[in-house]
Swiss-Prot record:
InterPro entries: Aldolase_TIM, Indole-3-glycerol_P_synth, Indole-3-glycerol_P_synth_dom, Indole-3-GlycerolPSynthase_CS, RibuloseP-bd_barrel. CDD domains: IGPS. Its EC number is 4.1.1.48. Pfam families: IGPS. The keyword Lyase applies. Disulfide bonds: none annotated. The gene is trpC. PANTHER family: INDOLE-3-GLYCEROL-PHOSPHATE SYNTHASE (PTHR22854:SF2), TRYPTOPHAN BIOSYNTHESIS PROTEIN (PTHR22854). It comes from the Bacteria. This is Indole-3-glycerol phosphate synthase. Keywords: Amino-acid biosynthesis, Aromatic amino acid biosynthesis, Decarboxylase, Lyase, Tryptophan biosynthesis.
Length: 260
């Protein structure tokens, strides 16, 4: 399964990073960071309208290289100027061609919150996300225990960050809710085989109480898709490949927000 492979390479990368910089040193780096002055992501999600998390992504396991020309800073700035509410940055290198320095540079250059899009499997990665400018992390229910889901979210909040707790099945949505998640992501992509079912998020949306913001992820391509998700009561959409392939990124974000 692709997800198992992703976790395996993440463990190898984590061990390498831990050898390069100890957790104690990383904590010191985080402690010295200036206060974040970007808009609070959770507060923004609770405001009316459908919010857009625009993703900076060069490749994926299912599609391979999505774009060969990858001016990641220019892309992120275009998203910011177009009115994106947050910017998701892939930092997984082996399957997504991501890198932590993309996150750090983008975080320094945009006015909106940034999400570290990766496979968080250890507290070290949460401190690492913070040290590189992220104010949002992703916690994937399928790869974490109930205790980890709760502990990692609480650690993120202690560091002044938010966690999107991502589910794909009804059972995972239940676990996300039981863990105390304050933001839930419903993925249309099955991370075990990377197949997409757009209706997955529509089917599971009703499981989440209205007081908890919900983000729809993956397979969102058209204005009709966006309108369906808005009508179903989603608070936000995360869009990656569709934006990355577009030559009119700013116009597309503006259109999605306007039509919703």
């Amino acid at each position: 399964m692709i997800l198992d492979d992703l976790v395996t390479v993440t463990k190898i990368r984590l061990a390498r990073h831990q050898r390069q910089q100890s957790l104690a040193d990383l904590k010191q780096t985080v402690a010295k960071m200036p206060r974040n002055h970007k808009p609070d992501f959770l507060t923004r999600l609770k405001q009316p309208g459908l919010h857009v998390i625009a993703e900076v992504k060069k490749a994926s396991p299912s599609k391979g290289t999505i774009v060969t020309d990858f001016p990641y800073l220019a892309i992120a700035k275009a998203y910011d100027q177009a009115g994106a509410d947050a910017i998701s940055v892939l930092t997984e290198p082996d399957y997504f061609n991501g890198h932590l320095h993309y996150l750090k540079e983008i975080s320094q250059q945009v006015s909106v919150p940034t999400l570290r899009k990766d496979f968080t499997i250890d507290p070290y990665m949460i401190y690492e996300a913070k040290a590189n400018g992220a104010v949002i992390i992703l916690l994937i229910v399928a790869i974490l225990t109930d205790q980890q889901l709760r502990d990692y979210r609480q650690l993120a909040e202690k560091l002044g960050m938010h966690a999107i707790v991502e589910a794909y099945t009804a059972a995972e949505v239940t676990r996300a809710l039981q863990s105390g998640a304050k933001i839930i992501g419903i993925n249309n992509r099955n991370l075990k085989d990377f197949r997409v079912d757009f209706n997955n998020s529509l089917k599971l949306r009703a499981m989440v109480p209205d007081n908890i913001p919900v983000v729809a992820e993956s397979g969102i391509k058209t204005q009709e898709d966006v309108e369906k998700l808005a009508a179903a009561g989603f608070n936000a959409i995360l869009i990656g490949e569709t934006l990355m392939r577009s030559n009119q990124k700013r116009q597309l974000i503006a259109a999605f927000k306007e039509r919703a």
